[in-house]
């Protein structure tokens, strides 16, 4: 029984499950539906679509009409060609013989039309001139009849305008009169030639008259059809321009909608990276200074000492000689040229030489002799002794100061120490100890930095 139930269940067709839809597709469809529900259709789109449809209908209609007009023009042209060829074969040589007459007749007709137009222009100019002259005469007559009326500025302006119109009308009349004379002369010449040819070719003219009359008829008909084709072509161009403008407006609206969607998806612009927890204003930045730690202070002191120790010997000699030769005579008058550098107390070096001893180390030459500039032998000897003594003293001071370094950053210009042997020896020993301490301190600082980086 159980086996039969299992067999029947296995024989039953399995239910067909619908294919699993991708989650991304479902999300995209949901987003599209949400956007369609949230956003309303821009009313401008409907108006532009209506214009687009109307322009499309106009273009189709104008193209159809234009094609029909062109087809009709071609059919009339073919018909005229066929019939005229038949008449030429029927009439024969008379058509060629009478062509000069019919050409002269066409020229005379054209000259007649031009003469008629010139006559109308001349008549119009004559009427304008007559009216302007009547206006001036009436104005002058009213001014003379009224004794109480004064010749004021308004009356003068009115007369000036009337006079100007009279002058313009006279110029127009003169030009139209010249044109009328020229056209009349051409018309008379054309008519005279046509009469001469008519007398000369009377028989050929009568024989070929049906041909040229039919040709003139078809010519007028073809001219009308050509004008219709030109009008339809202009209307078609206008309809295409409206269609193009509607497409351009739709494209602009689409760009605006996409830009609005993009900006709404991005959201408002927030603060920059690292500015979330910053409550300090820009005005407080100059007042806030970082507190120096031990490593930074030691490194600054080491840099100051190393810079002062590596001053070249030539610079120290030159600075010592120039500073004491051109500076003030007393140590108290020497200005402090550079501000003092802050450093830890453990690295301060007490100076073994006081300022009062600079006078002993570098004695200043006494006042110049009264005979400076004289040419006596005594003055020459005195100047030579002074120069030789100054050179000896300068060389001795330079030799004694080669092993010393002055604190140029804290005390202004480089100052030489005393040349006495006990004090110079003590200063040299102290500088050696300081350089050893600085090197040890630098090694320790570098080791601490490496440990911090490793940690």
UniProtKB/Swiss-Prot annotation:
Residues 1-63, 259-293, 306-345, 369-435 are annotated as: Disordered. Highly expressed in testis and ovaries. It is also expressed in a variety of tissues including spleen, lymph node, thymus, bone marrow, fetal liver, colon, small intestine and prostate. Residues 31-265 are annotated as: Sufficient for interaction with RAB11A and for guanine nucleotide exchange activity. Residues 44-90, 97-145, 154-200, 211-255 form a coiled coil. The modification Phosphoserine is found at residues 351, 375-376, 418, 421. Changing residue 347 to A: Loss of phosphorylation and binding by phospho-JNK. It is found in: Cytoplasmic vesicle membrane; Mitochondrion. Residues 22-41, 306-317 have a biased composition (Acidic residues). GO terms for biological process: intracellular signal transduction; signal transduction. Residues 1-12, 42-51, 380-396 have a biased composition (Basic and acidic residues). Keywords: Coiled coil, Cytoplasmic vesicle, Guanine-nucleotide releasing factor, Membrane, Mitochondrion, Phosphoprotein, SH3-binding. One of its GO terms (cellular component) is nucleoplasm. GO terms for molecular function: guanyl-nucleotide exchange factor activity; protein kinase inhibitor activity; SH3 domain binding. PANTHER family: SH3 DOMAIN-BINDING PROTEIN 5. Belongs to the SH3BP5 family. The N-terminal half of the protein mediates interaction with RAB11A and functions as a guanine nucleotide exchange factor. Four long alpha-helices (interrupted by a central kink) assemble into coiled coils, giving rise to a 'V' shape. Functions as a guanine nucleotide exchange factor (GEF) with specificity for RAB11A and RAB25. Inhibits the auto- and transphosphorylation activity of BTK. Plays a negative regulatory role in BTK-related cytoplasmic signaling in B-cells. May be involved in BCR-induced apoptotic cell death. This is SH3 domain-binding protein 5. The gene is SH3BP5.
């Amino acid at each position: 029984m159980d086996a039969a139930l299992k067999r029947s269940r296995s024989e039953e067709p399995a239910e067909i499950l619908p294919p699993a839809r991708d989650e991304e597709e479902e999300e995209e469809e949901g987003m599209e539906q949400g956007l369609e529900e949230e956003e309303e259709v821009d009313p401008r789109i409907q108006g532009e679509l209506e214009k687009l449809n109307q322009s499309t209908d106009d273009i189709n209609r104008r193209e159809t009409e234009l094609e029909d007009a062109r087809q009709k023009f071609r059919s009339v042209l073919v018909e005229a060609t066929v019939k005229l060829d038949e008449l030429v074969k029927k009439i024969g040589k008379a058509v060629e013989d009478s062509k000069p007459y019919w050409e002269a007749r066409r020229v005379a007709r054209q000259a007649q039309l031009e003469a008629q137009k010139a006559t109308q222009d001349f008549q119009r100019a004559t009427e304008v001139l007559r009216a302007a002259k009547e206006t001036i005469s009436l104005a002058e007559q009213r001014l003379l009849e009224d004794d109480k009326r004064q010749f004021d500025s308004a009356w003068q302006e009115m007369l000036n305008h009337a006079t100007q119109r009279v002058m313009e009308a006279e110029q127009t009349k003169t030009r139209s009169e010249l044109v009328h004379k020229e056209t009349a002369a051409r018309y008379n010449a054309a008519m005279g030639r046509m009469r001469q040819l008519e007398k000369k070719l009377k028989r050929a003219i009568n024989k070929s008259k049906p041909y040229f009359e039919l040709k003139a008829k078809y010519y007028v008909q073809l001219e009308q059809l050509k004008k219709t084709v030109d009008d339809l072509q202009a209307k078609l161009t206008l309809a295409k321009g409206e269609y193009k403008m509607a497409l351009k407006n739709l494209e602009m609206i689409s760009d605006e909608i996409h830009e609005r969607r993009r900006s709404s998806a991005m959201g408002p612009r927030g603060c920059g990276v690292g500015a979330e927890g910053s409550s300090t204003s820009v005005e407080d930045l100059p007042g806030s200074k970082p507190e120096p730690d031990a490593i930074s202070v030691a490194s600054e002191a080491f840099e100051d000492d190393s810079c002062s120790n590596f001053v070249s010997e030539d610079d120290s000699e030159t600075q010592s000689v120039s500073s004491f030769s051109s500076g003030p005579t007393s140590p108290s008058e020497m200005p402090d040229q550079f501000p003092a550098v802050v450093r830890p107390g453990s690295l301060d070096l007490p100076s073994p030489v006081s300022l009062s001893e600079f006078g002993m180390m570098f004695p200043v030459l006494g006042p110049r002799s009264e005979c400076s500039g004289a040419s006596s032998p005594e003055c020459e000897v005195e100047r030579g002794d002074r120069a030789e003594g100054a050179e000896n003293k300068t060389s001795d001071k330079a030799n004694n100061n080669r092993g010393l370094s002055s604190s140029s950053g804290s005390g202004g210009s480089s100052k030489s120490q005393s040349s006495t042997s006990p004090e110079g020896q003590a200063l040299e020993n102290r500088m050696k100890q300081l350089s050893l301490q600085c090197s040890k301190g630098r090694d320790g600082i570098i080791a601490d930095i490496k440990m911090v980086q490793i940690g």
